[in-house]
Every structure is written in structure tokens, then in C-alpha cells.
Amino acid sequence: MSKVSSAVLRQGVATILKEKKERKFVETVELQIALKNYDPDKDKRFAGSVKLPNITKANYKVCVLGDAQACEAAQKENIPFMDVDALKALNKDKKLVKKLARKYNAFLASDSVLRQLQKILGPGLNKAGKFPTLLGKNEDLKVKINELQCQVKFQLKKVLCMGVAVGNVKLTEDQLVANIERSISFLVSLLKKGWQNIKCLYIKSSMGAPIKIY
């Protein structure tokens, strides 16, 4: 049972969409969370991902780290890819791996590449929070990318506040509301005491002011 008023949420989303301006980029809509009654040092730090009904970021870039079959499929669909030789060419250079991590929102990797990734690249992608998702042998590349584009990840680190991208200003009011409701519902399921651990919730666009919804 959500404690966020449907009317308050809709009003907040409507305000974000009404105040959006023409920009050179599509603004992301973020859910900002402040927790309470939680000790990151003592309590278990939660992490989890959920697939939302609609795409979160408008220009979500995915790169395939693949075997020959996956790279061929990526090339056909005009999706960026790197094979093992291209990855080895980075020579575990921390700056180059960091640059690669910054260039894309997410990575997909074939099983054979995933198993040797740490050895080839070092821990760079993992440190950037972009460890690749497994791309199975017979999985449809476009479907897999769509799943990533709709996915949001919650991870508690050392501080009791976090922000996650839950949509963008190109979505409709209904689409944004659906994404935000699903995100909040999943977040509550991760928390030790559910709603008792939530201090407040805000939504905001990249360039807009935060709007309190709880």
C-alpha cells in the first residue's frame, strides 16, 4: 500500500512537464530518496533492480562486449560493440577503462567474455557501477537492450540519501506516474521496515526544482 497520495504525485509530475523547456538534451526525471532509522554501517546495505513500464533515459547508450556471434548481431542492428581483441587493446589502462564506462549507460556481455572480463579489463567497470549484464546465446539483442532501458537500480551506500532516474520529460504524465509508482513500491520492498524507513521523497527534472511528494 503506497503512502504517496496519487493526487500529489500527479500534481508533481504535471508541474515538471509543464515547466520543461526546449533544450539541447532530454531532461531526466529523478526520484530522490531520504531514508531514516537506518544505519549503513550496521544494517544490511540493500541493492536491487526493477524493470519499469517505460524507458527511463531518452538517449540510453548500450555497448555489447561480445563473442563473434554477438558482435555480428550488434553490427547488424547498428549497436556499438567491442570484441575481446578490442578490450585487450585497452591494456587494463585505468583511464581508458574509465573513459569507456563514461561513454555508455550500460553494457551487455557474452558469457565467454564475461568470464574473463576481470582479467582483461580489471575492476574498472564494476567500480563505475556498470558491470555488464549477461547476454545469453539465443537472446534477442533489441529486447535485452529495451529491458536495460527500462531498468532502475537501487543501491544503499554510506549515506542515507540517493537519486535514481525514473523517466524523462518526453514521457506522458501517465507513463511517468506509472514508472514512479513502480519504483517506490520496489524500494519499499527492499527496506527493512518498509515505509518506516522513508523520511521523504522528491521528484525533479535535470534542470528543475525538487518537488516533494512524501
From Swiss-Prot:
GO annotation, biological process: translation
UniProtKB keywords: Cytoplasm, Ribonucleoprotein, Ribosomal protein
Family: Belongs to the universal ribosomal protein uL1 family.
Function: Component of the large ribosomal subunit. The ribosome is a large ribonucleoprotein complex responsible for the synthesis of proteins in the cell.
Lineage of producing organism: Eukaryota, Amoebozoa, Evosea, Archamoebae, Mastigamoebida
Keyword Ribonucleoprotein assigned: yes
Complex formation: Component of the large ribosomal subunit.
Predominant subcellular localization, coarse grouping: cytoplasm
Signal peptide segment: none
One annotated Gene Ontology cellular component of this protein: cytosolic large ribosomal subunit
Subcellular location: Cytoplasm
UniProt protein name: Large ribosomal subunit protein uL1
Molecular function GO labels: RNA binding; structural constituent of ribosome
